[in-house]
Structure formats: C-alpha cells, structure tokens
C-alpha cells in the first residue's frame, strides 16, 4: 500500500508532548513511525570515540513518533487533514480529503 505520509511532508502532531506543533518529515521508517524535524526531542548520552573524532556528551536528537499520531497539514485550510488516493492521467496521486486538492510532492 502506498504511504499516506511521505518524506518532506508538512505534518502536525495530534498526540503526545508535542501536540499541536508542526514540522517537516525527515524520515519514514518501515515500522510505521516517522521522524519529524524539531519534534519529540530526546537527550542521548554520546560516548566519545577519539579515533573517529566524535566528542562525548549529552546531545539532543529527534526520536521516532508513530504515524498515527501525526496528520498532514493542509496549508489552504490551515488545519490537519486526511489523505486519499486517486488516478490522474494514469498516475496515482494523493489528495486532501477536505477540499480535493492534490498534494504537491
């Protein structure tokens, strides 16, 4: 099945500590999770690796969030929206269910 949320989509968080925040999808994982820019930040304790020039310390990075907890953001309506699929000129395209506009990739 085609993915409803893809890389570089603008999404809004529906649940969790970052509810209501918007961000861009940087990675879609096969486990049904997405990594969103600036959302779900966690602190990771990085061990130093002098051979590779990696400095140790506490670093902040984005953790994965379940795809069910995000929705694509429709700029035309200014709200979260649902995605549908249809065929246009023999190609399968995504569209917003609220206003029928196609999603630009």
UniProtKB/Swiss-Prot annotation:
Part of the 50S ribosomal subunit. GO terms for molecular function: rRNA binding; structural constituent of ribosome. InterPro entries: KOW, Rib_uL2_dom2, Ribosomal_uL24, Ribosomal_uL24_CS, Ribosomal_uL24_KOW, Translation_prot_SH3-like_sf. GO terms for biological process: translation. SUPFAM superfamilies: Translation proteins SH3-like domain (SSF50104). Keywords: Ribonucleoprotein, Ribosomal protein, RNA-binding, rRNA-binding. It holds the Pfam family ribosomal_L24. One of two assembly initiator proteins, it binds directly to the 5'-end of the 23S rRNA, where it nucleates assembly of the 50S subunit. One of the proteins that surrounds the polypeptide exit tunnel on the outside of the subunit. It comes from the Bacteria. Signal peptide: none annotated. Belongs to the universal ribosomal protein uL24 family. PROSITE patterns: RIBOSOMAL_L24 (PS01108). One of its GO terms (cellular component) is ribonucleoprotein complex. This is Large ribosomal subunit protein uL24. The lineage of its organism: Bacteria, Pseudomonadati, Pseudomonadota, Gammaproteobacteria, Vibrionales. It comes from Vibrio parahaemolyticus serotype O3:K6 (strain RIMD 2210633).
């Amino acid at each position: 099945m085609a993915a409803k949320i893809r890389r570089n989509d603008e999404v809004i968080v529906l649940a969790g500590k970052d509810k209501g925040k918007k961000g861009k999808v940087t990675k879609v994982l096969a486990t049904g999770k997405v990594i969103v820019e600036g959302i779900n930040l966690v602190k990771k304790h990085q061990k130093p690796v002098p051979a590779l020039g990696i400095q140790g310390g506490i670093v902040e990075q984005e953790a994965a969030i379940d795809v069910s907890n995000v929705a694509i953001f429709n700029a035309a309506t200014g709200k979260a929206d649902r995605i549908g699929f249809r065929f246009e000129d023999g190609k399968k395209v995504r569209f917003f269910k609220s206003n029928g506009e196609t999603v630009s990739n």
